[in-house]
Each structure stands twice: as C-alpha cells, then as structure tokens.
C-alpha cells in the first residue's frame, strides 16, 4: 500500500518543477496557504486559484478529460451525475484504481439536508478528482495532471482546499436553474456568488 509520502517522493520534484513557475508567474506563493479549484462541467475546464497580494489569482487550468452525466446536481447513487455546489476536500487516496485521487466531501450538509427533505436515502458518495480518462460521476483529469494536483493538495493541506463545481461558467452567463429541483435556484445563486471572487 502506498502512502501520500510515497507519492510525494515519486512525483514531488517533477510536480514542483511544473507548478512553481506557474505560481511565480501568477504572483502567488508556492506552496500556497490555500487553493480553490473551479470545475466547469460544460466547458470541461478545471481552474486552480491561489491567494495573490489582494485577490485570488488564476495559476493554471487543466482540461477535464471525462465527466459523466449532464447539467444539474447529483441526486442519488448511480445517476452518473457530477455534483454541483460548494465543496471541500475529504482526503487524498494514493492507492486509487484511477492512478491517484482526491476525495470531495460530497454529500455535504446542503446535499444531505435536501436529500432528507425529499426522502432520497442514497444521495451517492465517493466522488473524486482522479487520473485516467474515464469517469462515472467523478472528474477524470488524466494521469499527468492528477500527479501535479495531488502533490499540490498534499503540499497545501487538503483541509485548505475549496472546490466550486458548476454546470458552466456563471461568471460569463447567469444561472438558469429551470427544470431542476425547487432548491436549485438557491444552490446556483450561492455558487455564482462565490465564483464572483475569482476573475482575472
């Protein structure tokens, strides 16, 4: 069984060599005190933001190679949907069957509250940012990208990472929650409000 320390020993130097210049060019410290990931499902873009002098700065973007499902939040186990909302990380998995993975804290308190209110007893679980190029409800980033992201999260501390997951970029087009659950406008408004802080 591999440990996080094993992964740092294997991939740390190459990841640092790639990430340090990106952070320096953006005007951010490396490793940062905190980071924000923004995952855009429609655009299949994964943004990495870090604290700058006064405002967050965009450090890097990676393509999302696979994300199953379509627009709309994850509601139940097996629906193949990628979650939407404001999340934190729950840990790092150095022994993933998808090379390496980073666990998202889905379902969070918001998800659990609405699942309980609607009688959904199995809202799903085990949502990861991972390697490889296939996904069922997770974000598949490919192996080279997940090696860098894994090292970045390990160096930053997974408890210092925020994850914003949206159907598309609310900074460019306002939320259109028609046709979803009754609580979807509330969720999208919160996501859009948080995303406003991350603009170049």
Regions found by a protein language model. Name each.
Residues 1-23, 200:
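N-terminal secretory targeting signals
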Residues 18-36, 48-49, 64-78, 82-89, ...:
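N-terminal post-signal-peptidase region of extra-cytosolic proteins
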Residues 39-43, 105-107:
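Short, flexible beta-strand-to-coil junctions
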Residues 42-43, 63-69, 166-171:
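Acidic helix-start/capping segments at beta-turn-to-alpha-helix junctions
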Residues 43-47, 53-56:
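Primarily extracytoplasmic ectodomains and periplasmic/lumenal surface modules that are beta-strand-rich
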Residues 58-60:
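Residue-level detector of beta-propeller blades
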Residues 78-200:
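Exported/periplasmic cell-wall-interacting domains
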């Amino acid at each position: 069984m591999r440990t996080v320390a094993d992964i740092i020993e294997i991939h740390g130097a190459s990841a640092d060599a790639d990430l340090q210049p990106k952070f320096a060019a953006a005007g951010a410290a490396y490793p940062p005190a905190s980071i924000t990931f923004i995952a855009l499902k429609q655009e299949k873009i994964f943004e990495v933001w870090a604290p700058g002098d006064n405002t967050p700065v965009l450090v890097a973007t990676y393509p999302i190679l696979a994300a199953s499902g379509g627009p709309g939040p994850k509601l139940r186990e097996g629906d193949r949907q990628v979650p939407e909302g404001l999340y934190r990380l729950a840990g790092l998995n150095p022994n993933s069957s998808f090379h390496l993975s980073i666990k998202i804290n889905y379902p969070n308190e918001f998800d659990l509250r609405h699942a309980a209110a609607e009688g959904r007893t199995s809202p799903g679980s085990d949502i990861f940012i991972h390697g490889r190029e296939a996904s069922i409800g997770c974000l598949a980033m490919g192996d080279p990208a997940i090696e860098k992201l894994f090292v970045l999260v390990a160096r930053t501390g997974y408890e210092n990472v925020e994850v914003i997951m949206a159907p598309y970029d609310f900074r460019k087009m306002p939320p259109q929650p028609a046709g979803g659950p009754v609580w979807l406008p509330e969720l999208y408004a919160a996501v859009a409000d948080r995303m406003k802080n991350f603009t170049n």
